[in-house]
Amino acid sequence: MGNVFIHATMTLDGYIADVNSSVDWMNDLVATDKDYEVANKVAANVGAVVGGANKTNTIEEGEVPYGGTIKMPVFLMTHTPTDPIEKDGMTYTFVVDDIAQAVEAAKAAAGDKDVALLGGTISRQCLKLGLVDEIVLDVEPLLLGDGISLFGGLGETIKLERIDTSAFAAETHMRYRVIK
């Protein structure tokens, strides 16, 4: 069975979106071939994704995890029972209120591959429950000053072990193991 990991692109000051929940700042980023190589290596081993309820809106607007380059099951947290959505060869399954259940379903669907956690709230909840094995961050050379923090409000100390770090012209890529 693969790892459960947080995967996020964030600014140097720790934000994954601006104060309006927008990630438009990502449109101006310039990645190098080496950056794409690192991202593709991570994405290639993802077998399922767990995201928050906010992802439902972005999916309805056309966004898909990993740009649709890989087809995988997606499990989205919600407070309201919702039928699965089939879109562009991917199945979006909605799980009501139980993040541990969503992660277990994603692990079963992923088989030997990894499960990626996308979004700040989901990431913090999974860290608190001890469900996260690794954290993979792509840090952009940008300061937003305010916005939605990836780890803000976590409320506890989580010890990490650095697995890998690489830096190219555009991004710094960091991978950490969560010490349990």
Residue ranges and their predicted role:
Residues 1-180:
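Enzymes that bind and transform nitrogen-containing heteroaromatic metabolites
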